[in-house]
């Protein structure tokens, strides 16, 4: 096959069929009359992207702020819709328990999100935490906030499920097909792939850590990071089953970690994310944690959970894209032909059905009610210029680590 051969001509192409791309495909496939094509450099649900690693948190009450509440509630409804459509259980409704010293910034921002969004919740003092959740190390002065609408998401299963739902509705996905470049022309977008040329009227780019390889003009706005995940073996796994142990976040002695109950029956995810490194090349940068990093994760995990064995039984590293303020980009180019979804900063998967809808609507009509002004390219470019000029914008948003 000639590299210049046109292999597909479609209305909308989605480059990257992972967290956001799979959901954009699902929403687009529900629109009548559109021909929709996904282009994915790997297979259906793989271990190379930000969504991999078994599970992610779903939080309605976000420590990143009430900016995200509308998207969270929309996403929760859409997770339920996808579950009904496919018969798959994707959201584990365990709640999400945040534990930290009273007055910790993450707790205060979570509480503000609860108040502003009127979200269901529980507050627990140290005595209640020790009684109800003895798995945790609880210090005097610790408090807990239970996000009642929160839970855990089966991330690889969710991506594969959204892909299959889109295909059943008429979308096509080209797997194992790297995209080499995108060029705008007078009559649409030309997408060069390893298998040939795709012509599309619109293209949605959701390529995570590979974003700037596909859209190099975003290099001043988007960079790549590596998110580490670790699992440990409890001495008593029955204490960590979903009926007894919620999804959680913990801040202790300056360290932050998150995790979910056991899903495999022998291990539990306890993932310290105090340190997240930037990377230059998601294809070649380190794909596993060093022994020193594993020891550091073990020290943090055993301080937080005394009932686990002091050894990582499984670990992985996942490339992700980020922005300077950790606020995502969900916007369309000046031409209206290229839609960008990038910079989710480890805080995107929970919102992916809602963000996928935003991206689909931007491709279809150029606008979306869920596109917050801070998600625009204009905002991010103003912030980049302000940083260069050492200025503070009136709409600056506090940088809080997400997952």
Give residue ranges: language-model regions:
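C-terminal catalytic lobe of FAD-dependent flavoproteins
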Residues: 299-403
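Active-site substrate-recognition segment that forms the wall
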Residues: 26-30, 89-91, 197, 202, ...
């Amino acid at each position: 096959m000639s590299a210049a051969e046109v292999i597909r001509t479609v209305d909308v192409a989605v480059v990257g069929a992972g967290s956001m791309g799979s959901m954009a495909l699902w929403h687009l496939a529900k629109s009548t009359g559109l021909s929709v094509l996904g282009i994915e450099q790997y297979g259906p649900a793989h271990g190379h992207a930000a969504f991999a690693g078994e599970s992610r948190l779903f939080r309605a009450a976000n420590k990143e702020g009430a900016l995200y509440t509308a998207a969270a509630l929309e996403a929760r409804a859409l997770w339920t819709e996808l579950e009904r459509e496919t018969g798959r259980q994707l959201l584990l409704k365990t709640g999400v328990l945040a534990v930290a010293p009273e007055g910790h910034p993450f707790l205060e921002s979570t509480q503000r999100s609860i108040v502003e969004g009127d979200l269901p919740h529980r507050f627990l003092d140290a005595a209640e935490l020790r009684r109800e959740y003895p798995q945790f190390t609880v210090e005097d002065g610790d408090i807990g906030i239970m996000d009642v609408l929160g839970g855990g998401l089966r991330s690889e299963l969710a991506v594969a499920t959204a892909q299959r739902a889109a295909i059943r509705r008429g979308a096509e996905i080209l797997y194992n097909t790297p995209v080499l470049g995108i060029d705008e022309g007078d009559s649409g977008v030309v997408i060069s792939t390893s298998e040939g040329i795709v012509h599309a009227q619109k293209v949605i780019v959701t390529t995570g850590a590979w974003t700037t390889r596909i859209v190099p003009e975003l290099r001043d706005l988007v960079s790549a990071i590596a998110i580490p995940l670790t699992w440990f073996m409890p001495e008593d796994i029955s204490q960590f089953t979903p009926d007894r142990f919620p999804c959680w976040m913990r801040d202790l002695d300056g360290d932050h970690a998150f995790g979910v109950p056991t899903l495999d029956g022998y291990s539990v995810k306890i993932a310290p994310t105090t340190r997240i490194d930037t990377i230059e090349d998601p294809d070649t940068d380190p794909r596993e944690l060093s022994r020193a990093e594993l020891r550091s994760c073990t020290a943090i995990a055993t301080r937080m959970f005394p009932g686990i064995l002091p050894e990582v039984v499984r670990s992985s590293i996942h490339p992700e894209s980020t922005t300077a303020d950790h606020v995502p980009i969900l916007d369309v180019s000046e031409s209206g032909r290229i839609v960008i979804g990038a910079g989710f900063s480890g805080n995107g998967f929970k919102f992916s059905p809602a963000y996928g809808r935003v991206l689909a609507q931007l491709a279809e009509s150029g606008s979306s009610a869920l596109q917050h002004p801070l998600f625009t390219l204009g905002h991010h470019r103003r912030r980049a210029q302000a940083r260069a000029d050492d200025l503070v914008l009136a709409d600056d948003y506090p940088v809080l680590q997400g997952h």
